[in-house]
């Protein structure tokens, strides 16, 4: 059930197959829409998507009731920051298992972001692991204060500094493209596939002796293209 900041409550709503319910609160203009998916196509899990329209300011309370006997667990996420006001947050948030799609997909190389200048984890990056226990992200790539083209001015490219996991994904994509060129176009390993590509980068990843791997932030380690070739060449780093 749901309780508004003013104390108004919506009773327990039982889940139904592909059911969508909508309520309007008496006090104020707040409306809530709950979309139930008993068998999510992507995960197979039971999912409830909750949308609040014109929500009243204050603390909203959501209470989940277990309808059947046995073990039960649930997880809740807010949309990414670009989709909600900065003041919307959980009272007691947990930063783990906060990667966004498609990083959780199987046979996909998921990356988090870190600061390559001081090797610190980027605070706004999502973290693993996947809810089914799979190691996600696989790697961390540079994603803080990177130089990017932000436009054109009088025929010249304007360069700016930016941070984010989308930049880390771009850096990782570039590394994969160059490695695939070496494997396929240059004829060094023409039979490479997606799984083996991921394994090459995992085995060549840079790892800090002070951390244990795999972990929720850096996965199996940091992107290290030179480390991949060292591993191929049989060079053991100290």
Q: Where are the regions a protein language model picked out?
A:
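A generic structural signal for ordered secondary structure
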Residues: 2, 179-183, 228-236
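Catalytic-core segments of hydrolase enzymes
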Residues: 1-26, 32-36, 41-149, 203-205
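Short glycine/serine/threonine-biased micro-segments
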Residues: 124-126, 162, 217-219
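Short, electropositive, low-hydrophobicity segments enriched in small/polar residues
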Residues: 116, 130, 168, 172-174, ...
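C-terminal domain-closing interface element
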Residues: 210-238
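Hydrolase catalytic cores
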Residues: 144-213
